[in-house]
Structure formats: structure tokens, C-alpha cells
């Protein structure tokens, strides 16, 4: 099981949920999901995503979760062209949404479940983004790219992300920094 896999260190209950309706119903949904996960014997951290439903941030913060997850696309997504220019000012700081207004977020683990400087081919963005994550207090960040080698040359899976060791080696190495 995933719970027994030593390489699986946590889980996120729902990727980019778009909640609607009464807050009490959303709180109940989150509680039931957490209960279901933990009833399997899962004892690793449980995260919940807040990127797409900011008006429900208070409900998520009050939930019995170990951490909150966010996304970051500071240059946007799918420009359908390579962006030119200096985008470092876009990644100078990651301000955690709700970090100041919801104290319940402060003591929870924080992860960025997906990020990228979409459509930027330069290798300078990832080290700057990593610095912004560390400064903001994130413990974990996952870059978003998933082209298999057979199609990696053409970046077919999600055209805004182009990262692999074979065809964008300087970007790939910068991700390690």
C-alpha cells in the first residue's frame, strides 16, 4: 500500500478542489475525507489544497490536517510562446496566501504541490524560486513536468512546462541547485 511505501512521505487529499456551498458542508466533506484516509491506517502527514478555493481558507485551516498545499505559477501558464525578458522580480517573494490573516495556518506544514516558471526557458528561475520557498517557510516543493522521453523533445504533455535533462539540461540542473 502507499502507506507502507517508504518513498511516499505524505498525501494531499484533493488536488485543486473548487468548493461551493455552505462552509459547514465543506468542513464536513474535509473531515470525512480525512477520516477515510486515516481509517486505512495511514499515519503519514495529510495535506489539503487551498489554491483554488480561497474563500474556504478558514475551513481548511481549521481542519484536522497536518499541512496545507499551494501552487505557484508566477509567470502564468500557456503563453503559447517563450517569454522573453527578466522574470526574476516575479519570483522574488512567495507570500503565503492567508498567512497573515489566518493564524491556524502558521503551525501547519506547508508544501508547494506544483510550480513552474511557465514558458521561461532560462535556467535562472528555479534557484530564485527555491529561495522564495525557503524564505516563506515551505518544507516541500514539487516541480510540474511529466513528459516521457519518447516525446520530451517536443514538450507535448503540457506545453507551458518544458523541463527535462535531455532537452533542457541547464534548466534541469538549475532545479537541483
Give residue spans per PLM region.
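Active-site groove signature of glycoside hydrolases
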Residues: 1-24, 112
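Structural preference for beta-strand elements that scaffold enzyme active sites
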Residues: 7-12, 43-47, 67, 109-112, ...
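Conserved, mostly hydrophobic/aromatic
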Residues: 11, 37, 68, 133
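Active-site beta-loop-alpha junctions enriched in small/polar residues
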Residues: 13-16, 51-53, 73, 115-116, ...
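Surface-exposed amphipathic alpha-helices with a cationic face
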Residues: 27-42, 99-107, 116
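Short, acidic/polar
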Residues: 50-61, 122-130
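Glycoside hydrolase catalytic-domain groove-lining segments
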Residues: 58-119
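Substrate-binding cleft of secreted/luminal carbohydrate-active enzymes
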Residues: 119, 123-177
